[in-house]
């Protein structure tokens, strides 16, 4: 019997149960095991054929967890980013990896627009004033008429670009591909990032973390940004040089940042980001929402059906194929 191990420790308990119940109902021929904590993996990880998880949920324990998966044939990532999985040398070569590419356009677009509006209208300042019962009126900035740079032109950007245009923004795409989707006034190659960064009022990072993008937003790039510009990172923490960003924010070389992803997650309690007045933090929930499981269910069902039927070559969103 095929054994499926569900490891989703960062999801609310109800969502974990919902995932297991769905798999049990639609695939009664498989054995479902659930682990909510690292210690609960031990009875199951060595014999599991399928691991259902988020890459970020593995975190710093990814090497240890995947290294014990001696029977793994498929890691089903319920998110888009898989660097926490595919970059782990301990993952057996016979295991294929899939993700949920294409499922996050709407929630990530909403997160990006919320971030831009909250930064432009100084929402942290409003909340601090509310907490102090302090009445202070000030002029907020508009995002209409401003230029947004979207770094990474994938499925999310295809939704975000037109949405920004609808709000009256000028949209500049930055990408390593030659794709020209609608919703962009202009698209330039990633090699020109430092050249165009000074044009931007809002810089939204959506690109995957790879060897080519690791720390690509460094001190030199940040120094070219407008002092009135905002940085929004919804992709991966490793894309931005965090010490350089901290320095730029402290010295007000940029106006502020909204950060959903970090080099170390969970973010340590003593990290400088927590106490910075020009920073908005969220705990890697840009794509996650109350209806998330409902959104990914069709793809989970389709891929499980194909896998169990032996139609591996027909599976969707395979980001790493199994090796013989």
Explain the meaning of each model-derived region.
Residues 1-50, 55-57:
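N-terminal glycine-/charge-rich "phosphate-binding" loop or analogous flexible N-terminal tail
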Residues 41-46, 66-69, 143, 195-200, ...:
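A short, aliphatic-rich alpha-helical micro-motif
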Residues 125-159, 186-187:
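Glycine-rich NAD(P)-binding loop of Rossmann-like domains
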Residues 47-127:
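Phosphate/diphosphate ligand-binding glycine-rich loop within oxidoreductases
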Residues 98-111, 125, 263-324:
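C-terminal helix-to-coil terminal segments
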Residues 178-272:
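Rossmann-like adenosine-cofactor binding region
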Residues 166-183:
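NAD(P)-binding Rossmann-fold cofactor-contacting core
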Residues 63-71, 88-92, 222-227, 248-252, ...:
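Short, conserved loop/helix-junction motifs that constitute active-site signature segments
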